[in-house]
């Protein structure tokens, strides 16, 4: 199965799927069959996790120089209502897969990593405390990861109020400290030169730099 098919076979949104297929149709002229067989570079080892395979496909596109500007992928399995685990279990496995995939992606790109920015985010958080099934339920705030060229890494950015019940939103969830749009907008402005956020985030007013 070619890169195009792998990335869009499970796309739910019709507009996204159609646009993606049209974009990758152009890659046929660039030899996408050969591109799909391009091995990892710099000794990168992706492993077998689904996210790793998707990031490997994206790395192939970046390395091919076809002009890729934006790519979106996803990783499931985080809805751990039951048996979430701590240092071992579902959560630890997902975090391990995520870390390995990102590390391989960075290694594979080599010098091209300086031209790439990766944003990792979730659509909702988890409760701050365990439920009765040794898992966590849907919450409010969560964490984002930003890495790549132009990012001053090794830092935790944003406010953290702790886990005391009085510090939690509705006494159960982490409170939102940073608007997710601020991080996405800052990244889009830095990487793509976007000057007006309104087409993507109507009504949003950019805040001072979050990432610095």
List each language-model region with its residue ranges.
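Metal-dependent active-site segment of extracytoplasmic phospho-/sulfohydrolases and closely related
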Residues: 102, 106-133
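Short gly/pro-enriched beta-turn/loop segments at secondary-structure junctions
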Residues: 65-68, 113-114, 139
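Histidine-centered active-site microenvironments of extracellular/periplasmic hydrolases
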Residues: 124-155
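Sequence context surrounding c-type heme c attachment/ligation sites in exported
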Residues: 1
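Feature for exported/extracytoplasmic and membrane-associated proteins, marking the mature portion
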Residues: 4-108, 143-146, 155-212
């Amino acid at each position: 199965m070619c890169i195009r098919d792998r990335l869009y076979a499970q796309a739910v949104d019709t507009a996204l799927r159609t646009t993606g297929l049209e974009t990758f149709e152009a890659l046929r002229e660039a030899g996408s069959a050969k591109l799909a067989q391009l091995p990892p570079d710099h000794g990168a080892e992706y492993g077998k996790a689904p996210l790793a395979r998707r990031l490997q496909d994206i790395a192939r596109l970046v390395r091919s120089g076809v002009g890729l500007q934006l790519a979106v992928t996803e990783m499931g399995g985080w809805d751990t209502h039951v048996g979430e685990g701590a240092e071992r279990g579902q959560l630890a496995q997902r975090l391990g897969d995520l870390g390995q995939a990102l590390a391989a992606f960075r290694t594979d790109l080599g010098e091209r990593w300086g031209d790439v920015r990766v944003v990792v985010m979730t659509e909702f958080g988890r409760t701050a405390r365990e439920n009765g099934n040794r898992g966590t339920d849907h919450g409010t705030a969560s964490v984002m990861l930003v890495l790549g060229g132009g990012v001053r890494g090794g830092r935790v950015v944003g406010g953290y109020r702790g886990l005391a019940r009085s510090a939690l939103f509705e006494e159960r969830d982490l409170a939102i400290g940073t608007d997710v749009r601020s991080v996405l907008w800052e990244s889009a402005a830095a990487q793509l030169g976007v000057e007006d956020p309104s087409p993507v985030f109507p009504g949003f007013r950019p805040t001072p730099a979050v990432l610095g």
